[in-house]
Structures are given as C-alpha cells and as structure tokens.
Design a protein with these regions (language model features):
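Transmembrane beta-barrel strands of outer-membrane/channel proteins
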Residues: 47-55, 83-87, 128-134, 187-193, ...
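Short glycine/proline- and aromatic-enriched beta-strand/turn motifs that initiate or cap beta-hairpins
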Residues: 27-74, 84, 224-229
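Extracellular loop and loop/strand-boundary signature of outer-membrane beta-barrel proteins
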Residues: 54-57, 94-101, 155-161, 208-213
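Residues that define the transmembrane beta-barrel architecture of outer-membrane proteins
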Residues: 45, 63-67, 104-108, 124, ...
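Gram-negative (and chloroplast) outer-membrane scaffold detector with strong preference
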Residues: 79, 84-152, 222
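Short loop/turn motifs that connect adjacent beta-strands in outer-membrane beta-barrel proteins
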Residues: 31-45, 78, 117-125, 179-185
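Residue-level signature of outer-membrane beta-barrel architecture
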Residues: 73, 114-116, 175-177, 227
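Predominantly the C-terminal beta-signal and adjacent terminal strand-loop region
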Residues: 171, 178-229
C-alpha cells in the first residue's frame, strides 16, 4: 500500500468514525454539540458570497478547471450552511497517444461548516466542514486516424457524449480572514473521495467537473474572495 493510499484510507476511516460516533451518541450529547453559544448575538447574522480564484485561474490558463461560486448562511457566527455551484471544463490532448479528452458540465455541492475558534464573533474564522457533491456530465474522446498497414485504410477512435455522473464527499479545513469592511479572503484544504460514479462504456473518464482528476480520492485546495452581504 502506498503512503498516499494509506493516508487517504486513514482520513476516510476517521470521517466515517466521527459520523458514527455522532450518530450513536446520546441525544443530549448530540444536542450539546449542535447547540449555539448563549449570548445576546442574534442567530441569523446574514450571509456571504464567495468566488474560487484557483479553479478560475486553472480554467482560464490551463487545460482544465472550474468556475465556482458559493453562498454561505451565518448562524450565530458558529454554523454556516453552504451551497456551492460551479461549471467545470477540460480539453486536453495526450502528447504521446494523441487522444483528446473533452468535457464540460455544471455541478453543485451542499454542506455545512463550523467555526472552531473559541471567540465565535471575531473578525477571523477557522472552519471544519463537510460537503456532498454531484455532477452529471458527458465525455468526448477522439484520436487522429492511424493507417492500418495490412488493409491500408485509416482507423480512428471517436466517442461522443458518453453519459457519466459522480457523487462524492469532501472534508475540509478552511481559514477566513477579514480584510476591510465586508471583504474577506479564504483558503481551504479539502480531502475528496468518491461515493458512487458511472463512467462511460469506454472506461474511466480522465476529469470530472467539480471533482477534478478522476481518482478514488484526492487532495485539493481553494482560494476564495468572500463578500459579506
């Protein structure tokens, strides 16, 4: 077992164990975990919108990437339900095989973050969170024709609009730093792993919108511009 696979397995086991512990814990303990701090601050504290700059940069200047925006509700500066919507794309040709892979599709993620700092109402926040993601996309593969030396005709390879989809989870740690007024900057490190997936009949797809390179698990990062509203 490689070090990367060992780390991925350990993280996945930890996440599942925590979920099982929360599920099996007495109702009083569960309520205590999800309870808000008691003070004079109102429960609803507004919401914010965010834009991921890493994925946008990759999409603009590379052969794959995504444009992603998020909406985050603020409940008492402690709990933050999140919806993230995006559009991922890839257009890449292998230098050796000359096989070209192309896809583009929208995706969504829903989840929740918790502010882990003791001072919940400060300007900066440290989040731990979970996401569930889904996308339905179509994959296209093509390769230039090759001349068959025996029959002396050209043989090509072409797959168009093969239907695919994927469900996945993300566990994340994120930092939110206030700059000035409603403007924040945010960084997140994410561990992603597949739940269910359907590849095309031709085999494993190379890139999945919103998930990235199609492995059973992977690490990822975001850099966000955040505006409080």
């Amino acid at each position: 077992m490689t070090i990367r696979r060992l780390i991925s397995t350990s993280i996945r086991a930890t996440i599942i164990s925590l979920l099982l512990v929360l599920t099996a814990a007495p109702a009083s303990a569960q309520l205590k975990f999800f309870a808000l701090q008691k003070d004079s601050i109102p429960v609803f504290r507004g919401f914010s919108v965010s834009f991921d700059m890493v994925g946008a940069g990759m999409a603009l200047f590379g052969d794959r990437g995504q444009y992603e925006a998020g909406l985050r509700l603020n409940l008492h500066d402690e709990w933050f339900p999140v919806v993230e919507l995006g559009y991922g794309r890839a257009d890449c040709e292998d230098e050796v095989t000359k096989i070209r892979y192309k896809t583009s599709a929208p995706y969504f993620k829903v989840g929740i973050d918790r502010n882990m700092l003791k001072n919940k109402h400060g300007d900066n926040r440290l989040y731990a969170g979970l996401r569930y993601g889904y996308t339905s996309y179509k994959a296209n593969l093509s390769r230039p024709g090759l001349m068959d030396p025996t029959w002396n005709w050209e043989s090509d390879y072409n797959v168009q609009d093969a239907p695919c989809n994927m469900h996945w989870m993300e566990a994340l740690i994120a930092l939110d730093v206030k700059l000035v007024g409603p403007l924040h900057l945010g960084w997140s490190a994410r561990y992603k792993f597949r739940l269910f997936h359907k590849d095309g009949d031709f085999g494993k797809t190379w890139y999945v919108p919103g998930y990235g390179i199609n492995d059973s698990s992977k690490f990822d990062a975001t850099f966000n511009v955040i505006i409080d509203i």
